[in-house]
C-alpha cells in the first residue's frame, strides 16, 4: 500500500485450508510510507497449539513468523505414542512429517501417532511365536507303537501328510493394537520305528497373514519348515521331543493417512524361527481307553532381519529385538475306542484333552525404529501374548486299513490376552 500504516487493536488470524504454516514467513502488511504502532493483542487460537506465531515489525512492513509450538509428545497418551512423538518432534521441518503433523489439534494426534508407529513389526514376531505350535504339535503327535488293532507292532516305516489351518488373535491393550493372524500349511514326514524308538523328519510350507485393522497394516508371510523328532515308550511312560526350523519371507504394507498427508509403505524382509521341544506323559489304561497326564516344554526363538520400508516421509527403518519365549504346558489327555457291539476291536477312537499353558520370557516384543532420513530411533511394542492360557484339543482317529490311518483334530488356546484355534487333517501309512 502507499502511504503510512498505523497498527493497533487486536490481530485475529484465521487458517487457510490446504496451507502449511510451520517454518513459513507471511508478509501481511507492506506500506511505502512506513509502519507505525503495534497490535495490542494477537489471536491465533484458530490454529493448532503445535504452532507458535510471532510478529516481526519493520520500518515498512510487518510479518508473521511460524515456528514449532507445543511438542507433539505433550498430546500423546500411551508409551508407543510418546515414543513416536519424541522422534517426530526432532525431525527437520523439511523432512515431510512436521508440517502436516503440526496442523493437527491435540485430540487428533493420538490416532495419527499410532498409525505412524510401525508396531506391526514387533507384533509379527509374536505372531510367529504363537504360530510355531502348529509344527510342534504335528511332530509330538507322532508316537512310537501306534498300530492298528491286530497289526504287527514290530519295526516299521511310516509316512504322513497333514493339512492345517489356524486363527490366532492378540487382543492388544491401551498401548497396542489387536493383531490377528490366519495360517494355513501342509506338512509331510517320514519316520522309522526300531527297538521301541520312533525317529523321523518333517518338512512343509505354509502362509500366514497378519493384520492390524486399527493400524491399517498387514503382513503376508510365506513359511518353509524343517524338523526332526523322536519318541520312545517304556510301558505306560512315553517321552517325545524334537527340533524345528522355519524360514519366513515377510511382505508388509502400511497405509498412513490423516488431514493433509497420506503415504503407502511396504517392506520385505526375512525372519527365522528355531524351536526345541520335549514332552513326557504316562498313559493309564488299555487299547480301548486311557488317560495320560503330560508335561510339555518348548523354547521358541524368532529373529527378524533388518526392516527398510519403501514409501514417503512416514517410511521406517530399524529392527525388532530377537524374541525368546519358553512355553510350558501341563495337562491331561484321554482316548476312547468307539465300536459297535459286534466288533471285537475299535477302529475309531475319540481323543481329547485339556491343559494349562504358561508363557515366559519375551511376551512383549519391541522394535527400534526411525523415520526415513533420520537417525533418531524410537521404541514401540507389539500386542503381547498371554502369559497364562487354557489349552484344549479334540479329535477323531480312524484306521482305514491295518496300515492307513486318518486323523481329524481341533486344538485351541484361550487366554485373557490372546486366543488361538486350529484344525488339521492327517493321513498316515505304515509299510
Where are these regions (language model features)?
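Short glycine-enriched loops at secondary-structure junctions
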Residues: 243-247, 299, 356
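Outer membrane beta-barrel translocator domains of Type V secretion systems
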Residues: 94-291, 407-431
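Structured core elements
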Residues: 6, 12, 63-65, 160, ...
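Internal active-site segments that recognize and position negatively charged phosphoryl groups
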Residues: 289, 294-300
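Residue-level detector of buried hydrophobic side-chain packing
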Residues: 5, 26-30, 64, 161, ...
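Composition- and surface-driven signal marking solvent-exposed, interaction-prone regions
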Residues: 1-3, 16-18, 24-27, 41, ...
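Outer membrane beta-barrel transmembrane domains
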Residues: 274, 310, 314-431
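Extracellular, surface-exposed repeat/solenoid domains
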Residues: 1-107
